[in-house]
């Protein structure tokens, strides 16, 4: 009987309720990410970078097993990440991927890893709400899943950003617990995992500002530990000092407020205003709710919402400037709303702290704790009904947003190129082009799939066009002119300036193909519905492009 009553008591306890809420949340989040990830056979999605990451993870693992760490990267010899200067700025992310890349089907392993890492990122935010007892946690979970369609999409990409969210949540918990020394190893791990470790420095700055506002003192420890950890991660690094050079290159290209000198991925350009609002409506509403509910007058209780106000606002501004931040701002906008509303949801009267000092002195005997407003009296049955109705209504509205975003994201992922896209062309090169040849690829963002399916050849540009531009700006501009079709006789330039005899292209570079067809220099050696491979002849012939 005692055991039975003990079990009943445990299930009624706050800790058990939170545990059940977390398990339910984990199952829901895992299901959502699984359904999104496996709507396509390809490594998800938007771009082909996931193919590079999983292939390089395989290469890294083979290098570790053979005692060659880090292995050489000879695949982009004309860029700043040539074999001598290559930097793996996702090193730990690739190490985290090793158990999945070592599977018989690395494609499947990459997809499972993506679903797992994305789920953990969302769950870390949900855990923070549970840990700090923000009421109606499951409603906030729906808000996290509904906050932004680009957030759902980008969290499913086989990339490192989910770890950035996880590490930021861990850091926030350490801030709130005033446990600062673990920030140093966390910063080291963050720096080894992803080059957006600067977000951790930004978070440390905002926490110190929050302490300064509420406690009127300068809290230097989080700043020192985080900066020291980041510096240590940069220096104690197998790629030092080249990693510093690459970091400077990234900052120079990506953080400029003007137009880029060379074309970069669309993620580094700003959103259109209506696109920004439409894609992240729940996140925008969460920011508005956070601002309206923000009450900084309580000292200790005010630190959390002040911190999230600063962090979420900064991320929102960055998202408006760069689409690339779309996976960071939305969940922290929801956390900002949750922690701003926390006192109100708990029934406290923060407006009491705005009363004149003499009035507060008169009320002091009626307040239950020094420096804290008292809870509102226990609601009546009518108020319970009203409160439940409001919460249920909010949950329904959020669910509508979620289903809209979920199906829109699912449809967008479904439209991604299939896994075998470029596979036939790349395998033809692997069998018919001598190993070690440099191939002129007409799109820099085709490189990841070419690297995945045909690692026996090297390529002119890939991963980021800035790598070619920073190595040789003149050559990069020539590459753009050739691929965009403004050079009428491209073959001698490709052969003499780039050192390539084979050209790999998708079938959408119409101007380039027109000039190639009329030049008399090219033979089509392979062609399908996805790509075309051409060979530059030794001598020009007066005939149109044809199959030899």
Annotate each language-model stretch with its function:
Residues 148-151, 169-174, 181-195, 200-203, ...:
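Membrane-interface alpha helices of multi-pass inner-membrane proteins
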Residues 168-182, 288-301:
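Membrane-interface transmembrane helices that cradle and orient dolichyl/undecaprenyl
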Residues 42-49, 61-68, 195-202, 206-300, ...:
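Transmembrane catalytic cores of multi-pass membrane glycosyltransferases
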Residues 77-105:
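Short hydrophobic/aromatic helix or loop-helix immediately within or flanking a transmembrane segment
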Residues 431-471, 496, 500-509, 534:
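Short periplasmic/luminal acceptor-recognition loop of GT-C membrane glycosyltransferases, typified by
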Residues 1-37, 383-394:
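Start-transfer (signal-anchor) and selected internal transmembrane alpha helices
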Residues 112-133:
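Transmembrane-helix motifs of polytopic, lipid-linked glycan transferases
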Residues 359-431, 444-447, 463-465, 474, ...:
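Membrane-proximal, lumen/periplasm-facing interface regions of secretory-pathway glyco-
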